[in-house]
Amino acid sequence: MPKSSDGAWSEVFGVRVPDERSVPVGAILGTETSSPLEWWVAVAQDQYLQLDDVVLVRTAVAGAEALTKSGELAISGVVDMVQAKHEASNYPSDVFLANEGVLPLQVARWAHVVSTRLEPELWVPPSPGDAVVRVRGLDREKALHFDGMEERLIAGLSRDGQPIFIDLSFVDGRRGAHVNISGISGVATKTTYAGFLLYSLFHSNVLGIRAANTKALVFNVKGEDLLFLDRPNTKLSDEDRSRYEALGLPHEPFRSVGIWAPVNPRSPEAIPDTGSRQEGVQAYFWTVRDFVKEGMLRFMFSEAGDERSQIADVVARVESTLQREAKDVPGSPATVYIQDQLGEDVHVKSFRQLCQMIEQRLEANDDQLLGHTARGTISAFMRRLDGARAQCGHLIKGDDASNPGEHRIDWTSRQVSVIDIHNLHDRAKRFVVGVVVKRLFEEKEASGSAEPLVFIVLDELNKYAPRDGWSPMKEVLLDISERGRSLGIILIGAQQTASEVERRIVSNAAIRIAGRLDPAEALRPEYGFLSDNARKRAVLLKPGTMLLQQPQLPMPLEVTFPFPAWATRVSEAAPTTTARSPFAEPE
């Protein structure tokens, strides 16, 4: 962050900012039309303006003395375009003559500004010749509406090293909820920025006393990026540390992290199936009893399909029949009694046995399961059930389950719970996400209270809530996007292409963020919050730079965020002297 010439600093909303006076940079251009919403600035020869600079012009308004104390209107705005040309040049070759001193041409620079605030709200344009200044300190906070934010979430730094804030009331559900992040995989740093927003939430004072009970569920859908949130990053430089300090944030890993990984299918013991991260990871699975009584079958058929498909009817009928008939087995918390095709109670000891029983009852034309379904539909259902058993079966244990309570994902045990699914088949990924999110939604719905807040971080939304087709997984996520705000469930979703995600999920996000975009994707209507110039910038953004749009501003702001203080891969993770489970009681 740049320092002022006298080296003085001031505190603005708890963040250190340079204590600089506003700098005159030019005047309102007279050769271009200005309006209350946008205007042009002629840049002085000894000054410059760049994209995202915040500027202010004060203009006299005749006859408005009764509306303004000083008779002046203050219009603030943000630069979104800068241009330059030779004045009085008629031919392309004139530039060479000017360089040789033959033609006395002068370089003119001017900038386009989008208005962000008018005080008082008097909708008149600035006058040509009015002085324009680049603002700092409180004038900048007013221009960007930061002064009206009661609780400010640190979003990162602007191009000139000034802090950028998000109004927390548009994140936590009071006035709006949900965050959506788009960008090219591997370049847009979507997951990293989602992690930074969580870090800012939990390691600043923005949540106040609510921080102790606020939780986050983070799904690690690819690679091992999120499996080291509790480990310091050895690659963090002194410059990165100074950026954290400038934002008023510590440069340390997440303080309270629980890591869950699927049970290893190749081991008879309930050990986690992970790669580089082995210590401090808890294996998760569900029991046959959980599967039957909590209605999990639908999430094994959660690939996008036609909403009118009769397979969905068969799934619903089988699921409800199993729930109705299931009886607990004394002394066996992981298994159940289910009726076979003869109507006799059978002790179901494994997921494989449960699938076989379902198939036997369907082949025996069990009316409770069949209804009026065609035989071809039943055959399709059984083929998919076989596939689900092969791809997800190791996640459902029966009488071979040891201490099942210890392996049930407990999102309340730590502030941040990372649920690893990156090694699973796509069907198994959808199953885990669907089951966990559905259970969370039902628990919050039963509590009837929005507190404590729960944040869900999920990448690759296009897989779990695609625009076309219907699935139980998509239905749950859509429900969260529409009703989660009132229940205190906040979705921080990310995807490469917003055009392939269910439209209502994207549009319900109050905070829209774009990293680097594919040129064709940037032209899609889902990015209507980006101006034409912003779309062009989006295809050039570097890792660590995002375009942030929030309701209080009419245009997106470019935001940069520090390199993660937590490790994102095993090569960055600081070694631990003693392996200690994150699920152990704090010392």
Annotate each language-model stretch with its function.
Residues 155-258, 474, 503, 548, ...:
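Glycine-rich phosphate-binding loop of nucleotide-binding enzymes
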Residues 241-276, 507-528, 539-542:
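Conserved P-loop NTPase catalytic core
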